[in-house]
């Protein structure tokens, strides 16, 4: 693992450590990033190893939080992501934090976060990711019509591509399906599949089920 694979801003954070420690932490962070999709448990182990050497670095706590999130360890993810924010992380973590609240059975808190001042300052993909979580929170509460309202925005542009667009279209399709609007749901699952250039959803399988 080459520490130079880390983003420059993270390397700057690690510059407060002695060289040997910084190099070891960097290698663990690189490994965590590379493993996060295929083996999140291994990624979490690397992130925790980095934290054991440098628990006061925001990027390290963020890495632990993201890995824990991918493992479904909502409590640990929430604690670590909040710690990263307190330490000055500039990453857009609000959607992850809100989704952890959902995972812990607190959809009301997720919805509250999505209504806050910080949420109002988000734009682009970051705003869409939080919108998806907020809609999921409404659905958790059985408020499916309200979930659809949250997702019904100009961002539902069928010409968009990428993972966030694919997830947004997928969430919209799933909500339509929950309302019994199957034909419309099929169209949006098709759009999700077309937008999903990175394979983050199972939209193609959902299309097969509905077609």
Per-region residue spans from a language model:
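Structural register within alpha-helical repeat arrays
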Residues: 31, 63-64, 97, 134, ...
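Alpha-helical segment of the N-proximal tetratricopeptide repeat
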Residues: 16-52, 63, 69
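Structural motif corresponding to the intra-repeat A-B loop/turn of tetratricopeptide repeats
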Residues: 36-38, 71, 104, 141, ...
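TPR/TPR-like (Sel1-like) alpha-helical repeat modules
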Residues: 87-90, 119-120, 149-156, 180-201, ...
């Amino acid at each position: 693992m080459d520490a130079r694979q880390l983003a420059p801003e993270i390397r700057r954070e690690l510059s407060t450590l002695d060289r040997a420690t910084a190099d070891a932490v960097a290698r663990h962070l690189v490994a965590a990033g590379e493993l996060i999709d295929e083996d999140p448990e291994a990624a979490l182990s690397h992130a925790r190893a980095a934290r054991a050497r440098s628990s006061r670095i925001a990027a390290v706590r963020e890495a632990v939080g993201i890995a824990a999130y991918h493992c479904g360890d909502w409590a640990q993810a929430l604690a670590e992501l909040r710690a990263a924010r307190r330490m000055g992380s500039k990453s857009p973590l609000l959607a992850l934090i809100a989704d952890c609240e959902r995972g812990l059975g607190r959809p009301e808190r997720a919805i509250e976060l999505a209504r806050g001042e910080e949420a109002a300052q988000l734009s682009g993909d970051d705003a869409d990711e939080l919108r998806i979580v907020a809609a999921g929170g409404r659905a958790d509460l059985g408020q499916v019509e309200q979930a659809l309202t949250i997702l019904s925005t100009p961002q539902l542009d069928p010409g968009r591509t990428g993972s966030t667009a694919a997830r947004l279209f997928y969430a919209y399709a799933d909500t339509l399906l929950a309302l019994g609007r199957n034909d419309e749901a099929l169209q949006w699952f098709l759009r999700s599949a077309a937008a999903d250039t990175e394979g983050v959803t199972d939209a193609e399988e959902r299309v097969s089920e509905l077609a």
